[in-house]
C-alpha cells in the first residue's frame, strides 16, 4: 500500500504487504522489505528490513511491525522468533556478520528468518538501523 504523495525513485524494490506512508520519499536502489512500514514523511536513504517500521528524517528502524505481522497472518510464535532475531542483530555488541551467524545458530533459518537475513546480505545501500535505545525498548 502506498499512500498519497509518497515517492519512489528508480530501481526501488518494495516487498509484499509493505506500506509506505504519505509524503514519504524513498531513495533510488533502496529496498523496502515485506511487511515493512515506512512512516509518513520519512526520508528513506537505506534499506528498510522486512517486518519493521521505519520513521524519521533520515529513516531509522523503530520497531518490529507486530500489527502488520498479525494482519498478514503470522503466528504469535513466528512473531516471537522474528523479535528474537532482531534483538540478536541489533542489541548485542556484535558486528553485523557475527550477529547474522548468531541468528542462524540460535534460531535457525525458517522462511521468515531467511527473508530477513537475505535482505541484510544483499543490501547495497546499507540498512536503516535502529536508534538503539528506542529499539531496545520496543523490541525487548
What are these regions (language model features)?
Residues 51, 57-140:
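Terminal amphipathic alpha-helical/low-complexity segments used for targeting or macromolecular assembly
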Residues 2-10, 15-16, 20-28, 33-34, ...:
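Left-handed beta-helix
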Amino acid at each position: 500500500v502506498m499512500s498519497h504523495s509518497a515517492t519512489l525513485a528508480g530501481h526501488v524494490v518494495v516487498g509484499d504487504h509493505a506500506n509506505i506512508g504519505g509524503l514519504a520519499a524513498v531513495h533510488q536502489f533502496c529496498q523496502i522489505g515485506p511487511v515493512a512500514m515506512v512512516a509518513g514523511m520519512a526520508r528513506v536513504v537505506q534499506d528498510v528490513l522486512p517486518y519493521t517500521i521505519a520513521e524519521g528524517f533520515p529513516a531509522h528502524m523503530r520497531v518490529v511491525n507486530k500489527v502488520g505481522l498479525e494482519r498478514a497472518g503470522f503466528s504469535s510464535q513466528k512473531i516471537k522468533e522474528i523479535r528474537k532475531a532482531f534483538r540478536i542483530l541489533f542489541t548485542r555488541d556484535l558486528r553485523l556478520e557475527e550477529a547474522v551467524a548468531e541468528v542462524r545458530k540460535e534460531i535457525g533459518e525458517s522462511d521468515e528468518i531467511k527473508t530477513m537475513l537475505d535482505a541484510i546480505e544483499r543490501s547495497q545501500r546499507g540498512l536503516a538501523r535502529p536508534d538503539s535505545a528506542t529499539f531496545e525498548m520496543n523490541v525487548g
